[in-house]
C-alpha cells in the first residue's frame, strides 16, 4: 500500500498535468518541515498563469483539495508554486 502523503503529491501532479500545455515539464516535490508536508509544484514558465488561474482561483482550488486530503489523513499540508 502506498504512503497517503504520496497520494496527495500524485493528486496534485495529475491535476497540474491536465491544466498546463507542457505536462512533461510539471514537477512536484514533497518536503517534510516542522510537522507539515509541503507540496511544491513547478511548471514551465509559460504555464505559470494556467497553474495560478484568473485571480488565483485555480491555485486556491488546488490548495482546497490538498487541505481536504490532509484533513482526512489528520495531517497538515501546504501547496506552494515554485517560480
PLM features: residue spans?
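RNA-contacting regions in translation and RNA-metabolism proteins
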Residues: 1-48, 65-83
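Residue-level signature of catalytic and energy-coupling elements of molecular machines
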Residues: 26, 53, 62
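Short glycine-rich loop/turn motifs that provide flexible caps or phosphate-binding loops at active sites
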Residues: 48, 52-55
Amino acid at each position: 500500500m502506498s504512503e497517503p502523503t504520496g497520494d496527495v503529491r500524485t493528486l496534485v501532479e495529475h491535476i497540474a498535468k491536465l491544466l498546463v500545455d507542457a505536462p512533461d515539464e510539471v514537477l512536484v516535490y514533497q518536503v517534510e518541515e516542522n510537522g507539515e508536508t509541503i507540496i511544491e509544484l513547478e511548471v514551465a514558465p509559460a504555464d505559470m498563469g494556467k497553474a495560478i488561474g484568473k485571480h488565483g482561483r485555480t491555485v486556491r482550488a488546488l490548495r482546497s483539495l490538498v487541505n481536504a486530503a490532509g484533513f482526512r489523513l489528520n495531517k497538515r499540508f501546504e501547496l506552494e508554486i515554485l517560480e
